[in-house]
Each structure stands twice: as structure tokens, then as C-alpha cells.
Amino acid sequence: MALPEHLQRHLEAGRALTAAGGYRGRFAPSPTGLLHLGNLQTALLSWLAARQAGGAWLLRIDDLDTPRNRAGAIEAIQSDLRWLGLKWDGPVLLQSERRGIYHSWLSWLRRSGRLFACRCSRRELADQPIYSGFCRQAVHNWGWQRQRLPSWRLRVADDDPHGSGDVVLRRADGFIAYQLATVIDELSFGINDVVRGADLREALPAQRSLFAALGEAPPRFRHGPLLCDASGQKLSKREACAGLKPLRDAGLDAAAVIGRLASGLQLVAPEARISATELLEHLTQQAINAVIS
């Protein structure tokens, strides 16, 4: 089935941005709470990679999962980045303002016969690292389970080299899935290099499968180290991390915080005080790339 004209225009706009040359990166936090130091460390690394390459760095807010969003978080994210000197290019991109385009892609994929309804419960899926394809394989007599709203999955060949299994594009609660929104946004805005936290490495197979299904080349995905708490657990916004406030209340300025973040990445000596701009001038592309895998 041919791609509708308005979706083709979106793809062509993204291709034009990529074809123009140059690095195009982004930072894409979700507004489920304040940015903790781990988020800010990733933001710094992403910003450094883009600026060292002389490229663009966009700020996208992944706010589709509205029940989890926290009031005031979008404004706080922007305020913290500005305070640290991590300036982005262009307007802030809100995924919540792009629901129409995501649903258009979902509708086209569904009409093309590339999606199927999945009524497996979370409990049934819990022991499947890769989806078994149960709902794809046959028509089942669901009985009362037919009343359960389905998720919609992309059919992925069993021999797909990315090993993702069938990818959820719309969740059973009706929300557009992270994978679909992310892939469409990378294409729409011509993103060609993504630096993000290592916890998102597990999203790579699904995203690469979706790029392949759309016939589009993925960006280069790279991952920076995670910042963990004293128990070795990844910091989480949902666990009421206080973000920058305790540091600012203790009298630390932006240079001290940038120094702490850069020291955690082994880019500067411990206790260094350095602004984001000074750090950028201090580092080579090789030094930044050495931290990213």
C-alpha cells in the first residue's frame, strides 16, 4: 500500500535535514519527575557530542504517557538545562503535540496488514524476553478475553537479524508505544546520531526492526554510562530524586555541577569547576567518543 502524501512529506522533510549534512542529535527526557544527576550526565554527554561535531542538538519531551507525567516537570527540565548552560536548538518538541502523526502511521501500517492485535496479558508476557508470536500465529478462541482491549504489534519475521520479536506500536491502554513515537520522531527531524543512557540499549532491537519495516536507515545509536546510587541501582525519577535542588541549596553553582558530572564520566579531575562551554573547549571528539559505546 502506497504511503499517504502527508506521511511522505514528513519523511522527505526529515531526509532533507539529514541530506543537508552535519550532526543532528537530541536529548529526549520524559516529564515523570525532576531530572536527576544521571539524566543530566546523559544530557551533558549528548550535548558535548553534538557541539564538538559542530552539529544541532534538539530537546524533545517524551510526554505521551500522560498518567505518569508530573505537573511542572517540563518547565523544570528546561530550567535545569538552561542553568547548566546546555542550550538546545529550535523550539522544544513535545510528543503530545504529535499524536496525530503517530496515529496516522499506525493506521497506515494497520491498513497495510503489517500489524496484528495481541490480547496477551502482562502476566502471560512476563516470562517472554522476546514475544513468542502467539497472537500472530493463529486465530484463537479467546472467550471472555476478547473483551480485553488489544495492543497492536508489528509483524517481525522470525529470522529478523535484530531479534526483537513482534514490536508493540500501540499499547492495550490506547497509548502510542514509545518505540513508534521515537522512530517516527527520529525520521521526522532528521536525527542521525543518538547519545542516550545505557539502560535504553535494550530498546535497540525493536527500534531497528521498525526502521527496517519502514525502509529507512536508523541513526547511529550510542550509549553513555549510567549513574547509580550507593546500592548500585540506577537512579530513578519515580523514586523522588530531588534533582539539582539540594546542590543549588548547598551553594553549588553550575560550574561545580558540570565539574561533578564530567568527573563522573572521567572527563575531568574530581572536584573540578568548569562551565559547559569551557568543558567543550577542553575536550576532543576522541575523548568524548571514548565514554560512549
Curated annotation (Swiss-Prot):
PROSITE patterns cross-referenced by the UniProt entry: AA_TRNA_LIGASE_I
Top-level enzyme category: ligase
GO molecular function: ATP binding; glutamate-tRNA ligase activity; zinc ion binding
GO cellular component: cytosol
Superkingdom of this protein's organism: Bacteria
GO-annotated biological processes: glutamyl-tRNA aminoacylation; tRNA modification
Motif segment ('HIGH' region): 29-39
Binding site for L-glutamate: 26-30, 62, 178, 196
Residues that, per the record, bind Zn(2+): 118, 120, 131, 135
Cofactor field: Zn(2+)
Xref: InterPro entries: aa-tRNA-synth_I_CS, Glu-Q_tRNA(Asp)_Synthase, Glu/Gln-tRNA-synth, Glu/Gln-tRNA-synth_Ib_cat-dom, GluQ/Sye, Rossmann-like_a/b/a_fold
Keywords tagged on the record: Aminoacyl-tRNA synthetase, ATP-binding, Ligase, Metal-binding, Nucleotide-binding, Zinc
E.C. code: 6.1.1.-
Binding-site residues, ATP: 237
Motif ('KMSKS' region): 234-238
Free-text function comment from the UniProt entry: Catalyzes the tRNA-independent activation of glutamate in presence of ATP and the subsequent transfer of glutamate onto a tRNA(Asp). Glutamate is transferred on the 2-amino-5-(4,5-dihydroxy-2-cyclopenten-1-yl) moiety of the queuosine in the wobble position of the QUC anticodon.
The family this protein is said to belong to: Belongs to the class-I aminoacyl-tRNA synthetase family. GluQ subfamily.
Protein name from the UniProt record: Glutamyl-Q tRNA(Asp) synthetase
Gene that this polypeptide is encoded by: gluQ
